[in-house]
From Swiss-Prot:
Keywords: ATP-binding, DNA damage, DNA repair, DNA-binding, Helicase, Hydrolase, Isomerase, Nucleotide-binding. This is Probable DNA double-strand break repair helicase HerA. It comes from Methanocaldococcus jannaschii (strain ATCC 43067 / DSM 2661 / JAL-1 / JCM 10045 / NBRC 100440). Its EC number is 5.6.2.3, 5.6.2.4. The lineage of its organism: Archaea, Methanobacteriati, Methanobacteriota, Methanomada group, Methanococci. It holds the Pfam family DUF87.
Amino acid sequence: MYVMKVVGKTTTTHFTFESLEKIRFGEYVIAKNVDGRDVLGVIKNVVADVEKFVGEVKVIGVLDGNKIIPNRTPILPNSEVRLCDDEILNNIYLTPDGLNIGHLLTRDNVRVYLDTNKLVSRHFAILSITGGGKSNTASVLCRELAKKNGTVIMIDPHGEYISLYHEDMEGKIKVINPIINPVLLAPSEFANLIGIGDNEIEKRVYVEFAYHTVKHECPDAKGIEFIEKIENLLYEWSKIASVGWEIKYYNPLRRNYDRRKLEKEDFVILMSLIDTISKFKLDYALNIGDRDVIEEFEIGKINIVNLSGLEIPQMVTFVGFIAKHLLLKRITYLKSLKDVYSINEEIRRVAQSNLNIIESHYKVVTKPVLLIVEEAHIFIPVNEQNSASLWLGKIAREGRKFGVGLGLVSQRPKQLHPDVLSQTNTKIILKIVEPEDQKYIQRASEELGEDLVKDLASLGIGEAVIVGAAISLPSIVKIDKFDGVYGGKDINIVGEWMGLDDW
């Protein structure tokens, strides 16, 4: 260990020191404040002179056992500066029941842990350019969560994680194909599912009429049968429209039938709607079933929902459905646990019925659950509201109270809705080059200072700035390389070209 000295004026937040030995950007050092207490700082800039090195240090805080507390007094001028021992840093970053995700960029021997409770309950985001290491980071997190019997639902739009495997995750991965029962959707969600745009008002009106009518008249219809009955009813209405007669449709608010006179113009609308449904059935028949996809999720597993092969409207509908019913069923479960002890007999009866249904069909919501959304910008776009953004937003705002966590993964940060992004209290930010992306992330991150923003463009693959509730202090971390199997790696193009000789 060598001697380094504070030079020039000091403050409570910054100081400068000189060293005759080489020093590195990002190193952790300790100096005394004027109260004689040890203060931890990180070197944010290094200038080399002919005879010495000059380091500019940002103060992190006063060392108080294994904690960091705010520094209230300036650094002692002309005092000694020393490198922080690995042991001190290890004690700071060690978190009971934490997730072991990597090491400090400047210290291979200092492991970095994320507080599991704070990461899940207060939500997180993994942000990066394409190829920056976000899929590797998500895989490492899933490995660590699996070690703790975590219940995770991973939304996988491109099938990157369906091959996910690690020996520590043996028996803890379940791949789920997106199958939905249309009876469980609201009419507007059903319209979205079959590809009716928000601006196609007339079509959406007839979808709602037909949906309520079939649900009332055919209460046992499910899956593809339910859709076909809607299609048949619309066909009957198209014949009525061609002659200008009235149709009868069920109104659930009045619990009775209403009538509507059709014009010949309605014939064109209805036939177009029938064509849309027919095309949907042709493309997505395998994604329609008579079970609730929430029933497929298992406690203590990484449940991977493989959305590859779906178009964006169908993806959004699936994700909105999952987010909505996870949150609502979890709320129902927790409320019923209390209501079952109510002095009111009817409240007790309803609560016990809810608990029986949940224990039989939706056991996943009996434990806290983490919903990780890959390609999150698809589902929470900055200038658009959809069913997915509505319910993911509710989880971001209210999920902490009910044990439903949210993780967002995206390579397009500025396309994420700022209200939802700002609710993620821990940010794992890998390489970000575009200044607009950097500023956008900074606006959504209270702890991301200007000094850390400047570091984002210079990060290597797998290196991340981590800030927020789940980490002891803002840090630059080298994320572990996931030593199992996952599908997010770049294709070795030249290797495959050169392998043509093997064919």
